[in-house]
Swiss-Prot record:
Name of the protein in question: Snake venom vascular endothelial growth factor toxin apiscin
Origin: domain of life: Eukaryota
Cellular compartments per GO CC: extracellular space; membrane
Tissue specificity as recorded in UniProt: Expressed by the venom gland.
Organismal lineage: Eukaryota, Metazoa, Chordata, Craniata, Vertebrata
Record organism: Agkistrodon piscivorus piscivorus
GO BP terms, alphabetized: induction of positive chemotaxis; positive regulation of angiogenesis; positive regulation of endothelial cell proliferation; positive regulation of mast cell chemotaxis; response to hypoxia; sprouting angiogenesis; vascular endothelial growth factor receptor signaling pathway; vascular endothelial growth factor signaling pathway
Amino acid sequence: MAAYLLAVAILFCIQGWPSGTVQGQAMPFMEVYTRSACQTRETLVSILEEHPHEISHLFKPSCVTVLRCGGCCSDESLTCTSTGKRSVGREIMRVDPHKETSKIEVMQFTEHTDCECRPQSASG
């Protein structure tokens, strides 16, 4: 039995482990296709880019995760676009460097709920 296990281990070392189990192994086509499709996905957004009027404060963390549309469409003339949005709250530490104070508070961010491939605008 030990000789068989050794032979199997050597074979895997030569040919590679079964799909997806070894770093560098190719991801199967259907998984690549599914992951790349137009859909909501967790995205990091900068607090200052989302709330540019807050430049006098520092934030910890400086970015948050929200769901945003992203991915590929089946036709290059289409773009992955949000068709539904909602406001979500995230607890953030707001630091006022001038007053040397900080407090935890809830800030609102736009999160996408639905996505669709739509024709690209003439300006984009």
